[in-house]
Amino acid sequence: MDNTYNPQEVEEQAQQYWHKKQSFNVTEDLNKEKFYCLSMFPYPSGTLHMGHVRNYTLGDVIARYQRALGKNVLQPIGWDSFGLPAENAAIKNKIPPAEWTRKNIAAMKEQFLRLGNAYDWKREITTCDPEYYRWEQWFFIRLFEKGLVYKKNAVVNWDPVDQTVLANEQVVDGRGWRSGALVERKEISQWFIKITSYADELLSSLDSLDEWPAQVKQMQRNWIGKSIGTEIYFNVNNYPKRLKIYTTRPDTLMGATYLAVATDHPLAKEAASNNKKVQEFLDSCQGIKIAEAELATMEKRGIDTGMTAIHPITGKELPIWVANFVLMQYGSGAVMAVPAHDQRDWEFAQKYQLPVKQVIKPIGIEHDFNQSAYTEEGILINSNQFDNLLSSKAIQVITNFLEENDAGKATINYRLRDWGVSRQRYWGTPIPMIICEQCGIVPVPDEELPVVLPENVDFTGTGSPLTQCKEFVNITCPKCGQDATRETDTFDTFVESSWYYARFACKGQENAMLDDRAKYWTPVDQYIGGIEHAVMHLLYARFFHKLMRDEGLVNSDEPFKALLTQGMVLKDGHKMSKSLGNVVDPNHLINTYGADTARLFVMFASPPEQSLEWSDSGVEGAHRFLKRVWAFSHQHRDMLIDINDSILSGNGHVDWKEAESRLKKSRHIVHQILAQATHDYDRNQFNTVVSGCMKLFNEISDYSIETENDKFFIHSSISILLRLLAPITPHICHCLWQQLGFDKAIIDAPWPKVDKSALKTDEVDYVVQVNGKLRAQFTASTDATEEELIAAAKEHAHNFVVNHTIKKAIIVPHRQLINLVIG
């Protein structure tokens, strides 16, 4: 055993052992409690950054700890390998996306191996492999057969730079989430999956996710956006269809002074066909900002269509406007405007000098309608037969009236819209559909799956190369035998990441999407990833899990039992980025200090949910601690090996109850730390685990070894310390455990047990405050009376109370604190 800690040698030795023994390859075991730990799989960008190191170390620490508890632990890894960056790199560097992706995977896999993460590599998944996406295509066809998939023309979010459709969630502040381009509105034929059919369950089952952050659940509730309201029908003059609007405030219906429709509403297009100014307005709104957060602050613009609607109760005509603040994807794309009782409608009415009619009277307060709208409930006025009703009652009465007169109905509305999964890009899973002039849309037969993405395509930087690949596009219809064409859109990459966790459970299954192993391993017991995925990946994965459940592929309702959302890694107060020049290279860190130091620092520097501020001195401090542990173990190696031999031969036994006082006290501290660290591991509070390990090490390194019992105490304590540290710094703990003569490998060692008798103590440490300020400390018997404790406190704080009158002595037992109040 070398005297000096050499992390490179230590880590190579540990990793070779794990590889040789296949330590992390697992199979199903019904005799053990299973634990499935998964970090969101990475996109193969080519290099790991410190955010990756933190995220995947968190998952690894949890997996190793659960294994030490005796559970059957699965921790797989794979690659979310489709997506725009590979295609963009192909255009820029003239290299095929597949080649670029494979090269990056190889580089990142090497980095993961150096970190020492306990992955079952035989389950590795790469989503661009046909063997993976074959089953995605198969499942999509099953959904199509069940009526959960459809294709229709839809106004979509179009990214003019990436030349593709974006989901609502992929539009950030009106711009494409990858390109940053201003998003346009465009009508295009799209494939959709009916996520709205599961809206109620997606909402209600959030309540079962007790181990998810409240913030994430609330974000999903807001995104699903369930509201109970009323659908109201307005007849339109010289227009064949009624205009449907949705409102949660039918009590304000009598105050409607105009209607407004979205720029892409059919009625707006009808008006534009006969009105040049309306068409010009629609054209000016093509780049409209669509992020809801911006609707409140953006300039509200509109134009009168010249068309009018009939109020369903009064029969009066109301002008219909096109407005940029009405969104087609929410509600019906039309709203009734009540300027007196909706601030947005009020601002629009002020700008265009539209009438403001008060129909709700505030209760107990005055309101100036010239200054703003009154948006709360109250008593109805100016509402004909509904006058004097409270808003809460009027909502029900007016809705009933509308239903009786076929002018509306009570309804439930959702903000959530069906998931558009088409992307006009090359590097993605081909959508397994055929378009035949005779037969319409025909699914690819199962025996012809997978539809393999061709690699002989040209990249021009715009549109989809698949449309130019005749060998791919032209095909015979499997139904009628006539010439047909393949669908050239590919899946949104969120489709691949919506079910990968289940495929990990049965990697290698060639005859089915999933098998019974998926039912054994799912749901994932602990999922780790960023909160930025709250309303995209996490919602889609929950949806897919329910789809797979209903297909009989899994037997649980939710995919992820517990969710940990880690914070970012910052340097100088900012997120690490090349543009700011504050990036820390994990390779350099590992080459200089070793993977264990990197792991120890990222676990110690901050609680997992909070942002981590990078500190070079913190890294050096973590490294110094590991060197001290190594040096201490080396110093006492012979003694510890002898004690191990005694224990293994059955001769090593200590009656701790008969041990001397100082040993009992130190052993009490060690087991107190063990109990707290175990509790902290259970709560994923790894920073306090490390803090406890440092305290434990200080306790034993300062301990004077004088008797045989002392040797057994040091042996027991170093055994506890190494097992506490092993999930966080697995390499050094593996080597020290072996070199100190402990039985088996530490990866197979059970979690240390707290000796409850050691937690009991004959003595208690007290602190003494004088007028609230810490002045002294002393040790007293647990049997000491209050009088004895106060006397001891006075004695130890003598210099601070002499010549003063002690007015009161306050004992706080649970804090072992005595406060002397002097005059």
UniProtKB/Swiss-Prot annotation:
- What Pfam families does its record include? Anticodon_1 (PF08264), tRNA-synt_1 (PF00133), tRNA-synt_1_2 (PF13603), tRNA-synt_1g (PF09334)
- Where is this protein localized, as stated in its record? Cytoplasm
**Which enzyme class, named as a word?**
ligase
**Molecular function GO labels:** aminoacyl-tRNA deacylase activity; ATP binding; leucine-tRNA ligase activity
Record motif 'KMSKS' region, residues: 575-579
Any idea of its EC number? 6.1.1.4
Q: Name one GO biological process term.
A: leucyl-tRNA aminoacylation
- Please tell me one Gene Ontology term that the record gives under cellular component: cytosol
Q: Which UniProt keywords apply?
A: Aminoacyl-tRNA synthetase, ATP-binding, Cytoplasm, Ligase, Nucleotide-binding, Protein biosynthesis
Q: Which domain of life is it from?
A: Bacteria
Catalysed reaction equations from the record:
tRNA(Leu) + L-leucine + ATP = L-leucyl-tRNA(Leu) + AMP + diphosphate
- Give the residue interval(s) assigned to the motif 'HIGH' region: 42-52
Q: Which residues bind ATP?
A: K578
Please state which protein family the record places this protein in: Belongs to the class-I aminoacyl-tRNA synthetase family.
Which PANTHER family does the record cross-reference, listed alphabetically? Answer: LEUCINE--TRNA LIGASE, MITOCHONDRIAL, LEUCYL-TRNA SYNTHETASE
Q: What is this protein called?
A: Leucine--tRNA ligase
Organism listed in the record: Legionella pneumophila (strain Lens)
